[in-house]
């Protein structure tokens, strides 16, 4: 008997997230052989869907799994908002150390308790820095008078009206 697993993401061909999704799916196939068929929809956005739909499609059972930004769950698991704050995590190494430790385990449990999702692991989407083509940004004040695109996330948008 073959088990079918559907997995999806929202990034294009060159994205590190897409490449990581491929590695995940290929690893499952290699480790489980003919007992699994893995279908990876690499970019639902390209097909007219919104990235945030990954969660509802997984909850409904249409998908078995997906990757997504923790920002999409911050309203349901407010503790995830810690990693949405700009200038909070100084570098990747510290972020990995924190997420691979007790806090990462606690966050995974909170996600499961509040949403039913199981966290398989964490990866970075960049330390929450802000980049632009105009000037360096080192502290929040450096963003004055700039238009900045954000996710639909209160932590990202807080203060944007000042």
PLM feature spans:
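Short, well-ordered beta-strand elements
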Residues: 2-17, 21-25, 36-41, 145-149
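Charged, low-complexity surface patches
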Residues: 17, 46-47, 100, 149
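A generic structural signal for well-ordered alpha-helical segments enriched in polar/charged residues
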Residues: 23-30, 34, 109
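Contiguous mixed-secondary-structure segments that line small-molecule binding/active-site clefts
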Residues: 26, 52, 56, 64-65, ...
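Extracytoplasmic small-molecule ligand-binding "clamshell" domains
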Residues: 30-31, 37-58
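Short, well-ordered coil loops that connect the C-terminus of an alpha-helix to the N-terminus
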Residues: 34-35, 117
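Active-site charged/polar residues at nucleotide-handling catalytic sites that mediate phosphoryl
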Residues: 61
């Amino acid at each position: 008997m073959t088990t079918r697993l559907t997995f999806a993401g929202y990034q294009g061909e060159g994205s590190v997230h897409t490449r990581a999704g491929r590695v995940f799916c290929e690893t499952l196939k290699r480790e489980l052989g003919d007992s699994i068929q893995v279908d990876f929809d690499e970019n639902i956005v390209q097909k007219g869907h919104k990235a945030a739909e990954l969660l509802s499609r997984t909850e409904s059972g249409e998908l078995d799994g997906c990757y997504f930004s923790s920002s999409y769950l911050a309203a349901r698991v407010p503790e995830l908002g810690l990693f949405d704050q700009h200038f909070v995590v100084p570098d990747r190494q510290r972020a990995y150390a924190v997420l691979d430790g007790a806090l990462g385990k606690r966050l995974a449990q909170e996600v499961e308790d509040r949403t039913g999702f199981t966290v398989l692991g964490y990866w970075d989407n960049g330390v929450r820095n802000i980049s632009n083509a105009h000037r360096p940004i080192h502290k929040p004040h450096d963003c004055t008078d700039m238009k900045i695109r954000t996710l639909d996330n209160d932590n990202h948008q807080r203060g944007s009206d000042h």
